[in-house]
């Protein structure tokens, strides 16, 4: 982790001078400012709470960095996090990155310039060294930012197993998975691995269908309709609930008999789509744990690297 002292040593100035450059306090020559800014750039250092700690200030402000609020799971999780933070005396500042690297960089700089005490990170568009350079305490949700960053997640792998097992138990033999961004750092990757393992155990063939999360709703409808028309799947595991609802509706319109299991289990789904069988994540517990861990990190407590909460299979009401 790059520290304020490292910047000072590289620039050949005092730590106080680096802090004054960061906070724009007092008179400084252009040459000094340039030296400090170049040192920060060379070291990939992003100013944070350490710089303002010299002034003894804390705004009780936590940055929340997530891909989007369009996804109902993220929307509910963010709401629960904000509520838990408020109870603990903290306010939240939200940044949505939309899977855009530059947008994440810009928002990260904005959060740190606004002197957040810590960041709860649910997005991942940068490199490991970019996250290592951030001195502000970080707790990640479902993302492996660096080997040293604490990460909180649901048991996505077990969720994939439970979903696939439910489809097999309901009589499905030709089971597809509709998945989004399943790179190795994505939670859907582990859900897919659970699906693959359970099919292997039952000697069933795999059918992996990519449905990129960046697609518009209209694009998803068109593509999924084509897929269902051209295949005779009798079971589909969707790695998110919104896609699962879409698959169920399109299959019904096409008069196809299809068992569908989703993933997330939000209050919205439970209230408005009670007939959807899904893998339910413990959203309240996730939010409470994320808030507790980031505050403990801010307070200087030692915490573990990995925290994983169990998921449950929630059967829809026929």
UniProtKB/Swiss-Prot annotation:
The organism of origin for this protein: Lactococcus lactis subsp. lactis
Domain HTH lacI-type: 1-56
UniProt keywords, alphabetically: DNA-binding, Repressor, Transcription, Transcription regulation
Sections of the chain in a coiled coil: none
Record-given protein name: Sucrose operon repressor
InterPro entries: Cro/C1-type_HTH (IPR001387), HTH_LacI (IPR000843), Lambda_DNA-bd_dom_sf (IPR010982), Peripla_BP_I (IPR028082), SBP_2_dom (IPR025997)
Presence of the UniProt keyword NAD in the record: no
The keyword Repressor is annotated on this UniProt entry: yes
Gene responsible for this protein: sacR
Function as written in the Swiss-Prot or TrEMBL entry: This protein may control the expression of the genes that are involved in the transport and catabolism of sucrose.
GO molecular function, one term: transcription cis-regulatory region binding
DNA-binding region residue numbers: 4-23
